[in-house]
Amino acid sequence: DLYLLKTDGSGNIIWELIDSGTENNDWARDFIETADGEYVVTGTWNDNGNNSKAMLRKYSNTGELIWHEIYSSSAANEINEIIETVDGNYVLGGYTGTQHGDYKALMIKTNLDGQQIWKKNIQSTGSTEIYALFETPSGSYIGAGYCNSWRSLYLVERNTSGGGVFNDCNIVDVNVSGYYDIIPSSRGGYYLIDEGSNLTWINDHGETIFREYVGHANMSIVELDNGDIVVGGYGFNDGNSGGIISLVRLTPPIN
């Protein structure tokens, strides 16, 4: 079931709810506060181990369900990330395929009522999945994740109408299991963090400016007002014996 929780600035619970509409698994992967002060939640709906739907639900700021939409392209469909776009819509990223690893990247654009505008199943090398999304200044959408069946770095860009701009599977010597987050850089280009805890700064053409291993931090990036980068996440000890939670701050080199 979905578990939703809202707190005040001190961490005191304002409201919480458990929500489900099926006898199978339903869970949330991401949520955002919308421009109108309410919330949209996305993830997976009615997962029985073989079939599932991508889900988008909107709640009021008091936790009341406003609407619910599901999307599917094949047996298994899941959303990992949602953004609200400059043109007043939503874009979702995840995968579509089977529950056993034959994945294509999935990108969906909807209007503010969750009604589908376009949906793209994007083929790359091996199984492919989008974990993170960002809207560019030109209004296109970049997805970051994995390709080559969990072994390589994946970037894809679609324009506002869903047309392809690029679709890149970067197969390197070391398995890194894909990107987990992408954010714009105030210095131009984008910062990305991958499963192997490598922070990469690329320019607008996808060319690498710098790449640095940041220890056991691999899930999320923020840029501070002074340009420093903070990366949070976890890693694994030798032999995959269990990870530690880390927070790393660093100053990128001057471009």
Locate the predicted segments by residue.
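A sequence-level/structural motif corresponding to short, flexible coil/turn segments enriched
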Residues: 1-255
